[in-house]
Structures are given as C-alpha cells and as structure tokens.
Swiss-Prot record:
The gene is clpS. This is ATP-dependent Clp protease adapter protein ClpS. Binds to the N-terminal domain of the chaperone ClpA. Belongs to the ClpS family. Involved in the modulation of the specificity of the ClpAP-mediated ATP-dependent protein degradation. One of its GO terms (biological process) is protein catabolic process.
Length: 105
C-alpha cells in the first residue's frame, strides 16, 4: 500500500511516494516440507532422493533430516514459499517417500 503526498518545492509541487512499513513487512506465508519415517526405503536411498529433490541440501544435511525422521517420526526438510514446498513434497512422493507440507507458524 502506498500513499502519495504533495510537498511544496522551490518551483513546483512534487509528488512523493511513501510506502507504509507495515506493507513492506507483509511477506508471503512460509511452509514446512516434512519427511515422514519410511520403513520401506533404505536410509541411503532417502538421503540420495532428498539431495536430488532439494539440491541446496548438503549430504550431511540430508543425512541429518533422514535420521530425524527415522528417530522422531518426522523431519523438517526445508521452509519455503508454498509453490516450491508443494513441488518438493510431490517430488519426494513420486520417489515413493512419504512427505507433507504444513504452514510455518
């Protein structure tokens, strides 16, 4: 949301565009991509699949996420906008890996 203010200058009136700080802080909501424990696929397969689907994950990150899901039932893969979150989750599902998304608080 923007507000236009007229200010007197030396020669003419000048239009100045001001943005409300609240409008700048209004960001799109983020979503968590969750990996669920998988008793079917091997740990190695899940680690490889995580790195293929989310290329910014290091091997160590992928292993940590896989172990978190294995030990706790669910692991946090990434927090991002809705569209990439849906893509990541669906890509994991297409590889036979259980995944879901939920809104980040």
């Amino acid at each position: 949301m923007s507000i236009i203010k007229l200010e007197k200058g030396d020669n003419n009136n000048a239009a100045v565009l001001e943005k409300k700080t609240a409008a700048l802080k209004n960001k799109s909501p983020k979503y968590k991509v969750l990996l669920h424990n998988d008793p079917v696929n091997s740990m190695e397969y899940i680690t490889i699949a995580l790195r293929e689907v989310v290329p910014q994950l290091s091997e160590q990150d992928a292993i940590a996420i896989m172990l978190e899901a294995h030990n706790n039932g669910v692991g946090l893969v990434i927090v991002c906008d809705l569209e990439p979150a849906e893509f990541y989750s669906e890509s994991l599902k297409s590889k036979g890996i259980s995944s879901s998304i939920e809104k980040d608080e």
